[in-house]
Amino acid sequence: MRVNNGLTPQELEAYGISDVHDIVYNPSYDLLYQEELDPSLTGYERGVLTNLGAVAVDTGIFTGRSPKDKYIVRDDTTRDTFWWADKGKGKNDNKPLSPETWQHLKGLVTKQLSGKRLFVVDAFCGANPDTRLSVRFITEVAWQAHFVKNMFIRPSDEELAGFKPDFIVMNGAKCTNPQWKEQGLNSENFVAFNLTERMQLIGGTWYGGEMKKGMFSMMNYLLPLKGIASMHCSANVGEKGDVAVFFGLSGTGKTTLSTDPKRRLIGDDEHGWDDDGVFNFEGGCYAKTIKLSKEAEPEIYNAIRRDALLENVTVREDGTIDFDDGSKTENTRVSYPIYHIENIVKPVSKAGHATKVIFLTADAFGVLPPVSRLTADQTQYHFLSGFTAKLAGTERGITEPTPTFSACFGAAFLSLHPTQYAEVLVKRMQAAGAQAYLVNTGWNGTGKRISIKDTRAIIDAILNGSLDNAETFTLPMFNLAIPTELPGVDTKILDPRNTYASPEQWQEKAETLAKLFIDNFDKYTDTPAGAALVAAGPKL
């Protein structure tokens, strides 16, 4: 660690932060460990040491993102390009903010950070040097600095020496906005972005994921405008260099299924796809830990050691962790640097073009098959639909599975209209000759979740090509091509109708789900391209 690295309090004054008496610049993991466990710390700043060697922290009531508190400054930069919450048919979280309110929020955060001892972490978002963002994170909380050191790409000493930030993130978790009502905002908490100033402000929420997903939203704005796919997916590569990407919302299996001992991990959540291939945005993983076991997910379990950072888990007095306890939240998490997983792409998290594109869905209705092979039009239809069941706890206030449609399997992070992401993805897939599949990691007629063992065998069949050679039949209403048998998979579950006491039970639920799909897709029918895709969806 080089304290300050020549970064002076005067430089922070350019952002409006004054009277800083100490800057801890790009702290080492050892220093962060000492800082987090400092016995003089109180509240959510203080970490607890666990028996696995990782520090655990609490994020208070903010155990997930706060999408209702997300704002983007509407000005000449963004007015005509952003996908706004108050325009068009599609619902999203991109609420406009006036430049005046932005200045007020910025004043609150800079006042909070002024006169303090600050942690500054410079890191990259994006493994491709041509398109990466150089991001400077500023916080007064040691574990928040640890979180971004884990999650973003750590620069070399040479890269740090010439580091010039493209984007500034100021985390003022301890401050809130008392004037929120007069300003027409959702609450006293805020996560705000300004594309002209290239800055993110955080106030009121302690959730680390706001910094991670904030930069994802920015990459989702900048890259597609350059013709580069920006994707909420995990990715891995096989021995022959064959790349697979796994799209899916939180809790559908992206991290679990891409962390495969037979394949090298590119990354578990956020990727781009350009002329050279698929590349990670991040330098770490952010895995869910609820009900984590060493037997079911050994790679993730073994990644929880010194330098990993646990969030909202229950730590017993002896330092052991109760991974089954979801009393604080179902969205318990761990962040760790990607090299905590043994089988990764080195030295840079990128590989060639993807040939297999897998859409993960967790169907709470028990209607969709465990796997189906999609046509080109079905690929676009299901990508724009982004169906899953919201699983407990990744957003505040959601505890039971409820059906949701999230465009591009990541509507919360989209900055442009969903059709722009679909167009770029389709172009990349066509150029690479990629095939798409819909994989249901959710429930079936038994009321039980499809086992990880069966899902892994299905993924193996996709990746080794045996699914493409399998005989298929068509599931009515949804018109999906389903294999009649697959090695290592219980044949009985391949047709979801067989998991019900009677086919009529499936039919009834299927009609309900089909109607939800049709109603949701209506928002895309105002364009000729969208209207043409209706035929690829379910029919009643």
Curated annotation (Swiss-Prot):
It is an enzyme of class 4 (lyase). Keywords: Acetylation, ATP-binding, Cytoplasm, Decarboxylase, Gluconeogenesis, Lyase, Manganese, Metal-binding, Nucleotide-binding. Involved in the gluconeogenesis. Catalyzes the conversion of oxaloacetate (OAA) to phosphoenolpyruvate (PEP) through direct phosphoryl transfer between the nucleoside triphosphate and OAA. ATP binds at residues 213, 232, 248-256, 297, 333, 449-450, 455. The modification N6-acetyllysine is found at K87, K523. One of its GO terms (biological process) is gluconeogenesis. This is Phosphoenolpyruvate carboxykinase (ATP). Pathway: Carbohydrate biosynthesis; gluconeogenesis. It comes from Escherichia coli O1:K1 / APEC. Its EC number is 4.1.1.49.
